[in-house]
Design a protein with these regions (language model features):
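Hydrophobic lipid-interacting interfaces of membrane-associated proteins
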Residues: 1-66, 73-82, 96-191
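Surface-exposed, low-complexity/disordered segments
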Residues: 82-92
Length: 191
């Protein structure tokens, strides 16, 4: 670990985790974590039963933090002036790839279940290389007694335009008033 340069190589494996607090109880056979940071890359991973989270960037941690701070300031300025410029936001973001897969088993799912939320599958990916791209799906949601079969989301940048598509699909008997709903659109700099 080099704290001054924000360079590190960390990995951990937790076996047979059991945690109880009041009425909240978690139990999982293992959690694996990895975080590596060099002057020019970041790699991170978290794996727990059906949960897999992977993150990577082709910049070092200090540059990543600096770029995220700059992007946050640019986004705030654009929101305040009611003028979005997606290509300016994209170019101020650090390059990254983030991928998340989650099934029915794991510590996150136990926490959601404790809060009366269940889902069969969550899959999500978000990238920023030369453009912003994101794609995700949630299947078999049951939240506080409300059931939804499938929700999908997609983001795709083309120049200054960020297109989006959100879809909810349900079979008969599941939220019949919203059996199938799709919202498509985009954001482009405007005043």
């Amino acid at each position: 670990v080099d704290v001054k340069r924000l360079v590190c190589d960390f990995s951990a494996e937790i076996q047979n985790l059991k945690w109880t607090h009041d009425t909240l109880s978690f139990n999982t056979p293992s959690i694996d974590m990895l975080f590596e940071s060099t002057d020019s890359t970041i790699n991170g991973a978290l794996h727990n039963e059906d949960l897999s989270l992977n993150f990577g960037s082709q910049v070092g941690l200090q540059q990543f933090i600096d770029k995220m701070t700059k992007c946050g300031n640019i986004a705030l300025e654009q929101v305040n002036s009611i003028s979005l410029n997606i290509d300016t936001l994209q170019s101020s973001l650090p390059p990254f790839a983030c991928e998340l897969e989650m099934g029915k088993r794991g510590i996150v799912q136990q926490f959601l279940g404790y809060n009366d939320i269940k889902m069969k599958k969550l899959s999500f990916e978000l990238y920023n290389d030369t453009t912003i791209y994101g794609d995700g799906i949630i299947q078999g949601i049951d939240a506080y007694g409300t059931k939804i079969d499938t929700i999908t989301a997609r983001l795709a940048q083309v120049g200054k335009y960020l297109g989006y598509r959100f879809h909810m699909g349900n079979r008969a008997g599941t939220m019949d008033n919203f059996a199938s709903a799709t919202v498509k659109g985009g954001m482009l700099g405007s005043r």
